[in-house]
A protein has these predicted regions:
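N-terminal, Lys/Arg-enriched amphipathic/low-complexity engagement segments
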Residues: 1-29
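Active-site helix-to-loop segments that bind/position phosphate- or nucleotide-bearing substrates
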Residues: 2-5, 11-12, 59, 71-321
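Structured surface patches comprising rigid loops and adjacent beta-strands/short helices at the edges
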Residues: 11-14, 19, 33-45
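Short low-complexity stretches enriched in small and charged residues
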Residues: 17-24, 63, 139-140, 173-174
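Glycine/small-residue-rich interface belts in oligomeric ring/scaffold proteins
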Residues: 36-85
Length: 321
């Protein structure tokens, strides 16, 4: 993933000028080329953005994520049309969604194996690891016996403790997990739309009120990678801060061995979603699932702050750019 992720953390105005993003604060300004931007995270509820810029972001398939008062992602702005042959792809996707049971089986199995490996990497009880591997090996077509749910309970009880609940907002790490999952989900949705996929049409998730059912399917094997990263990041911390949010965005730039290449996790997401689109379009399965053991969580940060008086415009990008 060669482009940058832009975070807007303060009260600023975003506008379009000659195919550039312009960030204004008073009479101060920062300009950044749109063709170098992957995503913009609007992390301040008083920041504003012009209609012309919104239109251009959609045209260029640049993802815009908005957050709530707790700084958690709450919305994704993405193109209405993302592909020149979207109607043809839609037909293929509808047909595929009727017979995607084997793919969901593979996704669930990959997720549970990564959960087991996450516990193993953190030196948790080997008996629990073996139990999860057993769950993974016994997943049925379309996971009719719901091994995913059973495995998740065993996994989180071991990782976080038996009193842990993913729905409890008072547990600090839940906010960090929600933030990280939302960032990965947004990237999957962005790439999927660019491939002509309709994100409403899930393989397993079928919620009529969810615009991103497919993203919620495809994200599953990446969740344990997020869990491991966030677990290490938040260990011993008392607050979920702006610094943590930047570190979580940096997860997209951590290296992973994927399809024989040492690439960014963000680029692995691109290749992963493209492989799914190829399966739908051509009935050729080249999907490789991410392996948590192949991720390098090096202590690197590619964060550069552009100061506008007392305000900060944060750019998160690759080291070689």
């Amino acid at each position: 993933m060669t482009n940058s992720i832009i975070m807007i953390e303060h009260e600023m105005k975003l506008k379009l000028e000659l195919d550039n993003l312009v960030v204004l604060c008073g009479d101060q300004r920062v300009t950044y080329p749109l063709n170098k931007i992957e995503c913009i995270v609007l992390d301040n509820m008083n920041a504003s953005i012009t209609g012309r810029l919104l239109s251009k972001l959609a045209e260029e398939n640049i993802c815009l994520i908005t957050t709530d008062k707790k700084h958690l992602p709450i919305g994704i702005y993405s193109p209405y049309y993302g592909y020149s042959r979207s109607s043809k792809m839609l037909g293929a996707q509808i047909e595929f969604s009727r017979c995607g049971g084997q793919l969901w089986t593979d996704i669930v199995r990959s997720k549970i194996i990564n959960q087991a490996k996450t516990l193993e990497l953190l030196n948790f009880d080997s008996r629990v690891v073996d139990n999860l591997i057993s769950y993974a090996n016994s997943v049925e077509i379309d996971d009719l016996s719901n091994k995913e749910s059973f495995a998740a309970k065993v996994y989180f009880n071991e990782l976080m403790g038996v009193t842990f609940s993913r729905g409890n907002e008072e547990i600090l790490i839940n906010g960090a997990l929600d933030y990280a999952y939302a960032i990965i989900r947004s990237m999957i949705a962005k790439v999927g739309i660019g491939c002509g996929l309709n994100m409403h049409l899930g393989i397993h998730h079928k919620n009529e009120y969810n615009d991103y059912n497919l993203a919620d399917d495809l994200i599953e094997p990446f969740r344990p990678i997020v869990d491991l990263y966030v677990y290490k990041l938040m260990e011993g911390e008392e607050f979920f801060s702006s610094s943590h949010r930047k570190d979580i965005i940096n997860l997209l730039y951590k290296k992973i061995l994927y399809k024989g290449l040492n690439i960014d996790i963000g680029q692995a997401i691109v290749e992963y979603v493209k492989s799914f689109a190829k399966l739908v379009r051509e009935n050729e399965n080249t999907i490789e699932y991410p392996n948590v053991e192949n991720v390098e969580f090096a202590d690197e940060r590619f964060v550069f702050d552009h100061y506008i008086d007392d305000y900060i415009f944060t750019e998160v990008e690759r080291d070689e750019l």
